[in-house]
């Protein structure tokens, strides 16, 4: 899980999701997991 100032899609399988006021990226590739904060 990477914590970034701006979470964005890396590949076309990445999905931007908002959970508990945080923006998350989930993907089939575990390296692409990110959180904004």
Curated annotation (Swiss-Prot):
Q: Which domain of life is it from?
A: Eukaryota
Q: Which GO CC annotations does the UniProt entry carry?
A: chloroplast; ribonucleoprotein complex; ribosome
Query: What's an example Gene Ontology biological process for this entry?
Result: translation
Q: Which UniProt keywords apply?
A: Chloroplast, Plastid, Ribonucleoprotein, Ribosomal protein
- Database matches in PROSITE patterns: RIBOSOMAL_L36
Instruction: Return the InterPro entries for the record.
Output: Ribosomal_bL36, Ribosomal_bL36_sp
Residue ranges annotated as transmembrane are none
Presence of keyword Plastid? yes
Q: Which GO terms describe its molecular function?
A: structural constituent of ribosome
Subcellular localization(s) per the UniProt record = Plastid, Chloroplast
Family that this chain belongs to? Belongs to the bacterial ribosomal protein bL36 family.
Its recorded name reads Large ribosomal subunit protein bL36c
Q: Which gene encodes it?
A: rpl36
């Amino acid at each position: 899980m990477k914590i970034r100032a701006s979470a964005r899609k890396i590949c076309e399988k990445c999905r931007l999701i908002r959970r508990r006021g945080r923006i998350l990226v989930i993907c089939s590739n575990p390296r692409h997991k990110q959180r904004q904060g």
